[in-house]
Structure formats: structure tokens, C-alpha cells
Curated annotation (Swiss-Prot):
Name of the protein: Germin-like protein subfamily T member 2
Any single GO CC term annotated in Swiss-Prot or TrEMBL for this entry: apoplast
Signal sequence region: 1-27
Keyword Glycoprotein: yes
Cupin type-1 domain: residues covered: 64-212
InterPro entries in the record: Cupin_1 (IPR006045), Germin (IPR001929), RmlC-like_jellyroll (IPR014710), RmlC_Cupin_sf (IPR011051)
Length: 220
């Protein structure tokens, strides 16, 4: 094989690597191919979202669910009102969703990740400690007050904690109509069927008694 052929082969291999690793990193939801496609939630979703409704009206493009107040009398002292394709079908194929997140004093939105979206948010009221962790276990965090904004890169574990003495509120947005949410405590200890104790005791370097106690708190 000549030097020119070897160089050409290496160049093609390099292009293949670029295509495999770079192009997926730029993607989020697929781009729409029409002005809108209000989701028909009675139909089964496809890979790009729900099929379009046969007829639409102005009400399909407006949503009032981000108002408050929400009931924050929950175990974690937090409540979320989502505006995603399942609650607001007008978002179907548009690659966008939002949440209203409200905290009681001391309330925590526990460590979780959104596998299909980057998250951006703004504090509407209160003081919120926001943090996310990178894949090398570095924590980036800051206390934010009303009017201040944060961003969490796609898929990274993050949390929010109301460090104030009064309620706090965030409005968050995502570059996906259905970003998904994997909440670490309930994912690990409340799965159905449950993760075997042997896996969890080894992972967390603890015993069956501790694992069973945690499972009892997150049992579905």
C-alpha cells in the first residue's frame, strides 16, 4: 500500500470518528418539518414525538400550568409543575419544555439528571443553592437570588436547595419536549423490580439492613 493510500485511509477513519462522536453531541430533539404538530396524546408516540392532531384551535398553543402556588408539603419540600408535551401537547416537535419548581424553606430538589436535555433556569423568588457534578466528580455550585440564572449541561447530575427562610421558586427550561428525569434516590432504591441488595451493598459499601431501610422509604 502506498503512502498516499495509507493517508487516505487514515483520513476516512478520522472523518468516521468525527461523525460518530461530534454529530450526536450537537443533536437534541429533531427539527420540525412543518409549522406545528399539536400532539395527539391518544395515539402512541413515535421516535420524533406524537402524531399530529387532525384539528387544532388557539387553546392548543396556550398553557396556564406554570402558575402557583404549588403544594410543597412533600417529603423533600419541593413541588414541580411541568409544561412538557404530555401536559402541553402544543410543544410536540418543537424541542422545548419548561417547569415551575417551588420550594418550602429548606426544600431540596434531590440529585437527578435529564438524559435528553440541557437545563437552564432562573430564580423567580428566594435564594437557591444550585449545583451540578461533572463526569470527573467536580462540583460546580452557587447560591442564586431572584433574577439570577443557571445552566446544567445535558445529562449531568444536579440539584437545587432552598437555603432561605421563605419559599423559593424557579422557572426552568429544556431543549426537549420531554427531557426525562432520573432521580437518583428513587431510581436506585425504588425501582420496579428492585435492584438486588448485593449490588447496592457492594456499590455503597454498606449492609442489607441499611439498603432495606432505604428501599422501604422509596418503595412504589
Amino acid at each position: 500500500m502506498t503512502t498516499l493510500q495509507i493517508s487516505s485511509s487514515l483520513f476516512r477513519s478520522f472523518l468516521l470518528v468525527i461523525c460518530v462522536f461530534v454529530i450526536p453531541s450537537l443533536s437534541s430533539d429533531s427539527d420540525p418539518l412543518q409549522d406545528f404538530c399539536v400532539g395527539d396524546l391518544k395515539a402512541s408516540p413515535s421516535i420524533n414525538g406524537f402524531p399530529c392532531k387532525s384539528s387544532v384551535s388557539a387553546s392548543d398553543f396556550f398553557f396556564s400550568g406554570l402558575g402557583g402556588p404549588l403544594n410543597t408539603s412533600t417529603p423533600n419540600g419541593v413541588a414541580v409543575s411541568p409544561a412538557n408535551v404530555l401536559t402541553f401537547p402544543g410543544l410536540n416537535t418543537l424541542g422545548l419544555s419548561m417547569n415551575n419548581v417551588e420550594f418550602a424553606p429548606g426544600g431540596v430538589n434531590p440529585p437527578h439528571s435529564h438524559p435528553r436535555a440541557t437545563e437552564a433556569g432562573v430564580v423567580i423568588e428566594g435564594s437557591v443553592f444550585v449545583g451540578f457534578l461533572t463526569t470527573n466528580n467536580t462540583l460546580f455550585s452557587k447560591v442564586l437570588n431572584a433574577g439570577e440564572m443557571f445552566v446544567v449541561p445535558r445529562g449531568l447530575v444536579h440539584f437545587q436547595w432552598n437555603v432561605g427562610k421563605v419559599k423559593a421558586r424557579l422557572i426552568t427550561s429544556f431543549n426537549s419536549q420531554l427531557p426525562g428525569s432520573a432521580v437518583l434516590p428513587s431510581t436506585l432504591f425504588g425501582s420496579n423490580p428492585t435492584i438486588p441488595n448485593a449490588v447496592l451493598t457492594k456499590t455503597f459499601r454498606t449492609d442489607d439492613v441499611t439498603v432495606n431501610k432505604l428501599k422501604s422509604k422509596f418503595a412504589v
